């Protein structure tokens, strides 16, 4: 179909589907895949990862960064690696023993930092892009007893550079309705620590099981996946961030019928999102959830996903 110059109708996602590139993690196979957003040119660029979960792309430097949860939650052998965008020159930048179970990860290119959530470590962490200067920003618990309390498990992470804040999810028990989304200032309050900082806000609570977070900085909207039970779980949700949070507010659901939704990536200039679920599907849709379509189906247990305009 040819769109006339004066047509007010939006093109469908298929018209811009091949722009950019997706990077996705296959947990079951321990692999990183790269492909066009329409599913073409798919290839494996990294193999032999130890339960990969979150991924980000630094286009300017030509790097990808990803988290490995490690051999098992009890082993405390998670790590973070870096490689070139084509998968070459792989390097461990956060070795085993520094972070317990690293989950989703966020790149703050301007600030020169990587942020990530550590599930069994019950913390939000960050480091310089070379893996140095590791810091703990939030510590929700300590010890084995706390580590069994899933309400303390940190999973998703994103930052708001404008307001100098970061957001994270605490997922709660599987399908438990005890998940929450929190935020705090990037700068630690003077005289306080990751375990006792007083600036933490809970902006949504009683969520089924929130996982990954992404911010649409242009429109000031927070998006997240939830892998809990329907009707509010197995969804993509969104909410504006520049309004005063009121616990009990119900966020807008924009996508439904996921099969344990995990990763989410936004391409705001082209009005589209990409979502990965644990049943092995990749979905594309507009930011309002319309024009949903399948990109991949039943391709292993998929976790993190990232979009790069390359």
Predicted segments — roles?
Residues 128-129, 184-193, 239-246, 287:
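Short loop/turn segments immediately following beta-strands, especially the blade-tip
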Residues 3-19, 49-62, 96-113, 142-165, ...:
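Beta-rich, blade/repeat-based domains predominating
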